[in-house]
């Protein structure tokens, strides 16, 4: 659990709420997004000590990299700056906004760092260089090792001011890695930083799924021989093992509830059931002769998409959780799996077999219109949305046929490898906006 007592946050200047209402929020799901031009000069070491100079450099670089990862900020190259790094002011009175407008910036972030007595203070400000005013000012205090947390939190504040959502900066991504020869579940921060091992049983562990509050992780493990469900609290030593005869696989949490769906076969056929988070079967959800797997829920939890073989091949269906009425969603192609419902709207990312390879597509639930996001780069599978719906994590064999995890925009642009780890990495699952274990 994050020890928030180590990190103290104070507002530098209180601004009237009406000031922020004048900004038009950026639509982060817009595939034709005009990236926001922003400048992040080196921070100022306020007393000039060596630890401050190092912290100022690393802090500015980390903040720029963090914003750039979102794909909707255009970071102005520091080589284009008209001001010398050591003369860039921290407050509005010390800033020549024209110098920043002339190089194409619309916004400017400045920072000042103090390191003394084993503690760090960081002042961060966001300015609109066209309106020549400060939008946001924050002061953070903590240990030097807390610098990344300070930067993450400020980036969330910047995002909320400019887009209306705090973004992804406190989210995590769970995944499967074979680095030690077995399939273990790991979790890292949204940008691949700090990968941590979750399971340690030298067995096969699959299908990690986050609860809505980011505190619980459900997954399938073969540690006792057969596929059982494990429901584990990430910061406390407690949880549940769900083990019925047959298979117990593919968990998915119901949004806003301590309940999940999973595929079980204790009654013979592989059907989807609703369970409590403590492992009690509530009711059976599907009833068909074909295998039903891979449940995923709409943002309000009122509908469930899943994969079924009832049509003769794997296709995605949608069930109304109230009435039980089910309708087929995918019709194009003979193999469609791995559905992931966008947490903010009615689109579903999924994996389709096209041209002998697996590729990621997105389908509009209302219209049935599909868009291909990957093609001609190996197998691309297991898509998972970021909590704000702006990015998609997925696994791909595009590099030498070895499965790695990548992140791309919701429009399929700007794919980047997330992690550099031994072995293969598969099955990414993005957490809600805030997740435990950071």
UniProtKB/Swiss-Prot annotation:
It is found in: Periplasm. It comes from the Bacteria. Residues 1-21 form the signal peptide. Gene3D superfamilies: Dipeptidylpeptidase IV, N-terminal domain, TolB, C-terminal domain, TolB, N-terminal domain. Keywords: Cell cycle, Cell division, Periplasm, Signal. GO terms for biological process: cell division; protein import. Its main location: periplasm. One of its GO terms (cellular component) is periplasmic space. Belongs to the TolB family. The Tol-Pal system is composed of five core proteins: the inner membrane proteins TolA, TolQ and TolR, the periplasmic protein TolB and the outer membrane protein Pal. They form a network linking the inner and outer membranes and the peptidoglycan layer. Part of the Tol-Pal system, which plays a role in outer membrane invagination during cell division and is important for maintaining outer membrane integrity. This is Tol-Pal system protein TolB. It comes from Desulfosudis oleivorans (strain DSM 6200 / JCM 39069 / Hxd3). The lineage of its organism: Bacteria, Pseudomonadati, Thermodesulfobacteriota, Desulfobacteria, Desulfobacterales.
């Amino acid at each position: 659990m994050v020890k928030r007592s180590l990190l103290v946050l104070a507002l530098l200047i209180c601004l009237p709420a009406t000031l922020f209402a004048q900004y038009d929020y950026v639509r982060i799901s817009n595939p034709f997004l005009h990236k926001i031009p922003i400048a992040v000069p080196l921070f100022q070491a306020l007393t000039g000590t060596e630890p401050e100079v190092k912290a100022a450099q690393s802090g500015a670089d980390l903040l720029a990299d963090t914003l750039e990862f979102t794909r909707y900020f255009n970071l102005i190259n520091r080589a284009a700056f008209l001001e010398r790094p050591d003369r860039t002011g921290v407050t509005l009175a010390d800033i020549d906004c024209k110098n920043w407008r002339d190089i194409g910036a619309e916004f400017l972030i400045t920072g000042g760092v103090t390191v003394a007595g084993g503690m760090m203070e960081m002042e961060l400000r966001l300015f609109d260089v066209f309106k020549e005013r400060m939008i946001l000012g924050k002061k953070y205090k903590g240990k030097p090792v807390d610098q990344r947390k300070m930067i993450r939190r400020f980036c969330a504040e910047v995002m909320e001011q400019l887009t209306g959502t705090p973004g992804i900066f406190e989210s995590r991504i769970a995944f499967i890695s074979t680095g030690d020869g077995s399939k273990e579940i790991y979790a890292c921060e949204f940008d691949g930083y700090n990968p941590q091992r979750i399971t340690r049983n030298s067995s096969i562990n699959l299908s990690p799924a986050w609860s809505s509050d980011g505190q619980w992780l459900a997954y399938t493990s073969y540690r006792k021989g057969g596929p059982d469900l494990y429901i584990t609290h990430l910061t406390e030593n407690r949880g549940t093992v769900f083990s019925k005869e047959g298979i117990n696989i593919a968990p998915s949490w119901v949004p806003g509830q301590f309940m999940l769906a999973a595929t079980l076969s204790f009654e013979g056929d592989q059907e989807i059931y609703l369970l409590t988070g403590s492992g009690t079967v509530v009711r059976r959800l599907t009833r068909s002769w074909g295998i039903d797997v891979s449940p995923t829920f709409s943002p309000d939890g009122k509908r469930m998409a899943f994969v079924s073989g009832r049509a003769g091949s794997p296709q995605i269906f949608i069930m109304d959780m109230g009435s039980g009425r089910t309708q087929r969603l995918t019709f194009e192609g003979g193999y469609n799996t791995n559905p992931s419902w966008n947490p903010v709207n009615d689109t579903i990312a999924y994996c389709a077999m096209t041209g002998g390879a697996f590729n990621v597509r997105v389908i509009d639930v209302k219209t049935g219109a599909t868009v291909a996001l990957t093609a001609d780069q190996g197998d691309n599978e297991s898509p998972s949305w970021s909590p704000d719906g702006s990015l998609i994590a997925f696994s791909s064999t595009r590099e030498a046929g070895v499965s790695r995890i990548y992140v791309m925009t919701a429009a399929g642009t700007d794919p980047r490898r997330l992690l550099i780890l031994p072995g293969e990495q598969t099955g990414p699952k993005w957490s809600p906006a805030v997740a435990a274990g950071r």
